[in-house]
Each structure stands twice: as C-alpha cells, then as structure tokens.
Amino acid sequence: MRHRMKRNKLNRYGSHRRSLMRNLAKEIIEHGTIMTTTVKAKVGKEYIEKLITKAVKAYKIKDENKEESIALRRQLFAELGDRKLVNKLVDEIAPKYTGRNGGYTRVIKVGQRRGDGAEVSVLQIVE
C-alpha cells in the first residue's frame, strides 16, 4: 500500500535529495527561473513554496514581533545556508506576496531534452 508516500524520492538517498532541493531553491531565488526536469520541478515547487511562505510570515511580522521574525529568518538560513539569499527572499521577494495565500511558483512544460529525451520544464516565481 502506498499510504503516506506523497513525496517522490527522485532515485536519491535522503541527504542527496535535501541537497538537490536546497540547490534548486538557491538557484530560483537568485535567478527567478530555472530549467530542470519536470519531476524535479514539481518536487522543488513544493519545497520552494514552503520557504516563500516562511519569508512572507517573517516580512509581515518584522515590526510587531522581532523575535519571531528573527527565528523565521534563522530557519530560512538553516535551509539555504546563505544570508544574502535569505535577505533577498525576505526583503525583495516576500513583499510581493503578502496578500497571496500560496501559488508563488509555476511549472511550465517546455518539451524534451535533446540528449536523453527527458521531459523538461521551467520552474519560475510568479510575478
């Protein structure tokens, strides 16, 4: 039975999968859009949406509850490992989505990769 088997393992062990998701998140925060396989894009979308949700919460409460805002920034830093990206996520990307509940990213299927025929998609942050 496949109960509670929601996530795709991507044929990788746990630490490799976490590293892959972290790298996808770093690239999309830095560049705004990335091209990858469709399966990686769909799994990465879930991961990135959670990070952006934390960033939006940190942005909304930065004036009222300083401690909680700092705690959320530290959680983002633990996931990303780069202060510049955390600052960009909270200060530049999060303000665009304060009135939005989810749906911060989109996956657009592009076609097949020429070398191996893998289905390729573009993962981008919605403007």
Swiss-Prot record:
Source organism's superkingdom? Bacteria
Q: Which GO terms describe its cellular component?
A: cytosolic large ribosomal subunit
Q: Name one GO biological process term.
A: translation
Keywords (alphabetical) are: Ribonucleoprotein, Ribosomal protein
Indicate yes or no for the key word Ribonucleoprotein. yes
GO MF, any single term = structural constituent of ribosome
Against Pfam families, the record matches this protein to: Ribosomal_L17
Would the keyword Ribosomal protein turn up in this protein's UniProt record?
Answer: yes
Q: Which family, according to UniProt?
A: Belongs to the bacterial ribosomal protein bL17 family.
Can you state the subunit structure given in the record?
Part of the 50S ribosomal subunit. Contacts protein L32.
The protein depicted here goes by the name Large ribosomal subunit protein bL17
Q: From which organism does this entry originate?
A: Fervidobacterium nodosum (strain ATCC 35602 / DSM 5306 / Rt17-B1)
Upper classification of the source organism reads: Bacteria, Thermotogati, Thermotogota, Thermotogae, Thermotogales
